[in-house]
Amino acid sequence: MPIKRLDTVVVNTGSQNDQHSASVPPVYLSTTFKVDLNNEDAQNYDYSRSGNPTRSVLQHQIGKLYRVPQENVLAVSSGMTALDVILRGLVLLNGTDNHTPTIIAGDDLYGGTQRLLNFFKQQSHAVSVHVDTSDFEKFKTVFQSLDKVDCVLLESPTNPLCKVVDIPRILRFVKCISPDTTVVVDNTMMSGLNCNPLQLNPGCDVVYESATKYLNGHHDLMGGVIISKTPEIASKLYFVINSTGAGLSPMDSWLLVRGLKTLGVRLYQQQRNAMILAHWLENSCGFKPTRTNKATKTRFVGLRSNPDFKLHKSFNNGPGAVLSFETGSFEHSKRLVSSKKLSIWAVTVSFGCVNSLLSMPCKMSHASIDPELRKERDFPEDLVRLCCGIENIVDLKKDLLAAMVDADIIEVRENGKYLFNKLNKNLAVNTTIDDLHKPLSIYEEFYNQDLIRKDSELNIKSSKL
């Protein structure tokens, strides 16, 4: 039987765990389940903290997405819960009187991840060493300078600077010199449809995602999923979940099963929008380095101008739908995000939703990171992050353009024929509505292939360090 593509397998749930073979899996809200003492071996559920039929259906679906058995998958209450469970179950227990568990993580982290790592450090549960993981030589130097590394925490592209981490190369290096080091990948920015770090050669130990983002896609639930390389790893993590009650609720599990069914079509449109928008920002709006202002830049892994374009393409099926740009001015960026002209773009944190979101990370998602630390890590204070939804791309560009004009960043000239960037003096043809009749094969312009519709199996070429 031929292997089905991933956007097909997440649609079909079958009739698993339903005696009536319903076409849509039911939601089991029951807290407890009757026990048959004469047939205890046949008892799958007793208490929903330990397991629930609806959660099992979800874990089965995620297992199909990542090509692993259902028992390797665990669903929890949020993405941060997922990371907390992973660290408690696999890393913190390595602590002894003579050793504090050591974690190497990136320097462009989600604020919540930074907060959790700081908490463990303050409580002396673990030591976090931050390095630019997109620079392999820096990572290698830091890794070799430490006596023992218990965990490496990776994310690519990084959020929100969109830096590409060479995950395959880091995995080969770490597993070659320190096989016992646990390598964890936060795959939220890509989702299992675009990347499967478990199937790299060698694969990572654990992947997790905030299911609040792409997997659900509607921002009407909070959830997280953990996908382990082996059942043995999953068993350790399940112990933490069962002990603490961190499992995802039945209703949220049911909503997530439903959201997963449209992952393929949602992500296709979101990535298409992101590609067109990034090209428009860089070329028509002039957010690229110029002689008068080298601080302006568009950051997106789907742009050929991105130096890591080929690297990202080598182990991912698509670019995702998160991009960011720098205006070159903190005040102008703040005016843009605060503009009352925005009617489609919602000013809020998070990403992966069907509606488009806009934010200023230094004031929102990354506000919990100390300003001095942001400066030390070269985090641009004027950075504006865009998370594309599924709306019509022309409407998205018009809405953003109106806000940029209102913020005194862009001036529309000659009855809309040209766009003039007031901050870096770039003048370019206005292509705001040019994409109205372009075919949906915009992927081919960037990658020379239709990424979402191609076979989802990655062909990873092994190479030496």
Curated annotation (Swiss-Prot):
GO molecular function, one term: carbon-sulfur lyase activity
Enzyme class: lyase
A GO cellular component annotation in the UniProt record: nucleus
Chain positions found as N6-(pyridoxal phosphate)lysine: K213
A biological process from GO: transsulfuration
Cofactor(s) in the UniProt record: pyridoxal 5'-phosphate
InterPro entries: Cys/Met-Metab_PyrdxlP-dep_enz, Cys_b_lyase_euk, Cys_met_metab_PP, PyrdxlP-dep_Trfase, PyrdxlP-dep_Trfase_major, PyrdxlP-dep_Trfase_small
NCBIfam families: cysta_beta_ly_E
Annotated protein name in UniProt: Cystathionine beta-lyase
Organism: Saccharomyces cerevisiae (strain ATCC 204508 / S288c) (Baker's yeast)
Gene: STR3
